[in-house]
């Protein structure tokens, strides 16, 4: 993914002025179709390019096309350029304005996504990444969100320093890696009329499954993913604690060595002997490499996302349960009367 932004036009590195994203209904339908097809084929994520243009303070997404599956025999950049040339021939907006990716229950944060968006945003100033939640949309909640990297995240990637001190100086955490850009879906007036007519044609009983309680599999999947991320974060914490213990032990050894050398030099000076040479302490005690903290930060963000979704899901399920119980009690009371 990181190399796919290389062929795009380079923009000046000033702060973008994009206030919101306007996505055509055609592009949304193509994104939805591609993501659902790939989710049925057991592919982890579906990805594609977004095409459009920038008009004043909005980014218009007018078309898109999917990226091919990973194949060593195919040049991805050449494929992308060829697709843009073909779209240009048929008078379709061919300017690259970002990319899209599918997500699993809102959890899209990953190292590969951060790296890809960094390369896109440094090559194309206005670029965004559009995240489509396949599973949540399949339950009736269209989830389409646009994100951009924050200035702190871009500075972090430019410096390439992921130590705790560097992240603390940048005041960056998983909460401010991305900034969400409002996204609106635009349809032509004729399309809106047709949607209104189709809505009236749907029977009332078809849209009344709001009290469906068969959601155990969804909650089970989220809890299983949450447990995996907690285990991963625990392993990262163990690694960092081990590093801190090594640093403390090394500092103690260094202090003992310096005290011993000072005592030896004092004894030699009392005997009018030449003192021992002062050796470089850092050569004797080489500092341990600091484990990078970027991956633990991302895992913590994934845990936070899963926790929020589980909390929201349980609240909705409890509300459904109480409503269903009230309706059942009313039905039984009516039958008894």
From Swiss-Prot:
PROSITE patterns: MPN. The keyword Protein biosynthesis applies. Residues 21-153 form the MPN domain. Transmembrane segments: none annotated. InterPro entries: eIF3h, eIF3h_C, JAMM/MPN+_dom, JAMM_MPN+_peptidase_M67A, MPN. One of its GO terms (cellular component) is eukaryotic 43S preinitiation complex. Gene3D superfamilies: Cytidine Deaminase, domain 2. Its main location: cytoplasm. It is found in: Cytoplasm. It comes from the Eukaryota. This is Eukaryotic translation initiation factor 3 subunit H.
């Amino acid at each position: 993914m990181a190399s796919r932004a290389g062929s795009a036009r380079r923009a000046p590195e000033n702060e973008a002025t994009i206030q919101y994203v306007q996505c055509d209904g055609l592009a949304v339908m193509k994104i939805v179709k591609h993501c659902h097809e790939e989710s049925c084929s057991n592919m982890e994520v579906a990805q594609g390019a977004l095409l459009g243009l920038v008009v004043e303070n909005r980014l218009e997404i007018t078309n898109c096309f999917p990226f091919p599956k990973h194949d060593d025999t195919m040049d991805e950049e050449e494929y992308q350029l060829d697709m843009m040339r073909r779209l240009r021939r048929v008078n379709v907006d061919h300017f690259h304005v970002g990319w899209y990716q599918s997500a699993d229950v809102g959890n899209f944060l990953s190292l590969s996504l951060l790296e890809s968006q960094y390369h896109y945003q440094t090559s194309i100033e206005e670029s965004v990444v559009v995240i489509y939640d396949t599973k949540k949309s399949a339950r009736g909640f269209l989830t389409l969100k646009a994100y951009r990297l924050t200035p702190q995240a871009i500075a972090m990637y430019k410096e390439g320093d992921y130590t705790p001190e560097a992240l603390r100086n940048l005041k960056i955490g998983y909460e401010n890696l991305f900034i969400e850009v409002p996204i609106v879906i635009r349809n032509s007036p004729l399309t809106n009329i047709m949607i209104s007519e189709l809505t009236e044609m749907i029977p009332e009983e078809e849209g009344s499954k709001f009290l469906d309680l068969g959601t155990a599999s969804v909650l089970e999947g989220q809890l299983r993913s949450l447990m995996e991320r907690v285990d991963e974060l625990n392993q990262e914490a163990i690694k960092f604690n081990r590093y801190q213990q090594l640093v403390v032990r090394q500092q103690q050894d260094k202090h003992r060595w310096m005290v011993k050398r000072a005592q030896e030099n004092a004894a030699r000076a009392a005997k009018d002997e030449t003192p021992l040479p002062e050796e470089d302490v850092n050569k004797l005690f080489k500092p341990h490499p600091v484990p990078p903290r970027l991956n633990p930060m991302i895992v913590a963000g994934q845990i936070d996302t899963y926790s929020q979704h589980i909390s929201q899901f349980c609240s909705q399920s409890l509300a459904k349960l109480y409503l269903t119980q009230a309706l059942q009690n009313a039905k039984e009371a009516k039958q008894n009367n």
